[in-house]
């Protein structure tokens, strides 16, 4: 399908769905009483149609993902709340996201009190939980931490972005089994701390993780988030760190060390229009943010900036990203840069759609990519639809 047709399809899709009555697209979660507890089943799905312009691949492509999120919850008169919840996903190779295609993305027990939240199980770390970045029209297809990408390695059929995925939020402990604590917000300040004993994705301490050199253990993450009003504007900012210990090390390998920060400013021009801008930065000794490639010599740095303008249910945005992974033993120096322009429309609390254009460029100081060259240029026009159960 020619690029022009994809562009027209994206524009027509946004226009058509924007005319649909909002109330018709609100999906409520299924809720069933179980004794004194409540069982709630939520879900979400995303689907993309796009036309990638890349070496070795042509024509229209599609990708998508589906998630089910059951939660069993019990609230007590004392203010204590207990729940057991999970996220179970199915996706194709271009929508594997930051959890690398895990079927079980989250499965954790949680206790909530006036003193904060405690989680035990497969869940995100403190840094990722409190992360702040620039505004995103559609987080699912953003340059930063996307769920869906548009480019496929013609040899492996996996996402090209597996080479170096830009994720500026601190997240060294991924969804490894862990203990996590998040404080309540006090005077705009919120704190979080997490500990993952291993890289295993079971209950903490039950498994040592994958049998690979440089395997990480004892990963601590800490984060602080601050929110305040600056006159009519609102500001959010965060900073985070992660530190781990390497096992079965090769020469030069060490425990992962991760630092990151981000901020976002929202300014309401009037009752209908809001201008937003922000960004985030991360640096790590993990080559291309692969924690099993953490080396004493070599740093990976990534930055992301974006701005967006919202008008009622519409949102237009522009994103820029850049990443550099220093050369380490067995891996070349990698450079990545990206640019994205997008337009989105929120149909209801359960449905939204976006379309846009994205460019990614990669380069390396030795060897070649699948196109036989040390440079790789990619771009795509896309249409992306999001559906989810409403929390309202």
Please annotate each region the language model reported:
Residues 29-49, 57-200, 226-229:
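Outer membrane beta-barrel
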Residues 376-392:
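Outer-membrane beta-barrel "beta-signal"
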Residues 47-51, 86-92, 124-126, 195-199, ...:
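Transmembrane beta-strands of outer-membrane beta-barrel pores
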Residues 41-43, 84-86, 118-122, 191-193, ...:
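Membrane-embedded beta-strand positions of outer-membrane beta-barrel proteins
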Residues 69-71, 108-110, 180-182, 223-225, ...:
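Outer-membrane beta-barrel architecture
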Residues 78-82, 115-119, 188-191, 231-237, ...:
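Repeated loop/turn-to-beta-strand initiation elements of outer-membrane beta-barrel proteins
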């Amino acid at each position: 399908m020619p690029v022009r047709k994809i562009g027209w399809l994206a524009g027509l899709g946004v226009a058509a769905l924007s005319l649909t009555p909002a109330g018709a697209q609100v999906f409520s979660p299924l809720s069933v009483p179980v004794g004194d507890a409540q069982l709630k089943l939520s879900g979400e799905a995303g689907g993309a149609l796009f036309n990638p312009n890349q070496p070795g691949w042509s024509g229209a492509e599609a990708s998508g993902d589906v998630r089910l999120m059951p939660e069993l919850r019990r609230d007590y008169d004392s203010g204590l709340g207990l729940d057991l919840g999970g996220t179970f996903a199915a996706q194709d190779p271009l929508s594997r996201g930051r959890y690398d295609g895990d079927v079980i993305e989250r499965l954790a027990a949680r206790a909530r009190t006036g003193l904060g939240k405690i989680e035990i199980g497969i869940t995100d770390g403190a840094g990722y939980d409190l992360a702040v970045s620039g505004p995103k029209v559609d987080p699912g297809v953003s340059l930063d931490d996307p769920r869906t990408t548009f480019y496929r390695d013609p040899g492996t059929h996996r996402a090209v972005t597996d080479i170096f995925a830009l994720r500026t939020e601190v997240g060294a402990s991924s969804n490894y089994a862990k203990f996590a604590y998040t404080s309540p917000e006090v005077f705009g300040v919120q704190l979080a701390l997490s500990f993952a004993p291993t890289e295993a994705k079971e209950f903490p301490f039950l498994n040592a993780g994958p049998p690979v050199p440089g395997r990480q253990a004892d990963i601590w993450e800490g984060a602080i988030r601050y929110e305040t009003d600056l006159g009519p504007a609102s500001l959010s900012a965060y900073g985070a760190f992660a530190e781990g210990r390497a096992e079965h090390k090769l020469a030069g390998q060490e425990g992962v060390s991760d630092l990151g920060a981000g901020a976002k400013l929202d300014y309401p021009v009037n009752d209908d229009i809001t201008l937003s801008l922000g960004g985030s930065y991360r640096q790590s000794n993990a080559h291309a943010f692969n924690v099993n490639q953490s080396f004493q010599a070599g740093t990976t740095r990534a930055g992301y900036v974006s701005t967006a303008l919202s008008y009622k249910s519409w949102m237009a945005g522009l994103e820029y990203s850049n990443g550099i992974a220093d050369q380490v033993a067995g891996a070349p120096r990698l450079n990545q840069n990206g640019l994205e322009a997008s337009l989105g429309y929120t149909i209801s609390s359960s449905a939204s759609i976006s379309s846009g254009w994205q460019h990614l460029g990669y380069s390396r100081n030795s060897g070649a990519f699948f196109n036989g060259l040390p440079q790789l240029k990619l771009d795509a026009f896309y249409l992306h639809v999001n559906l989810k159960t409403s929390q309202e």
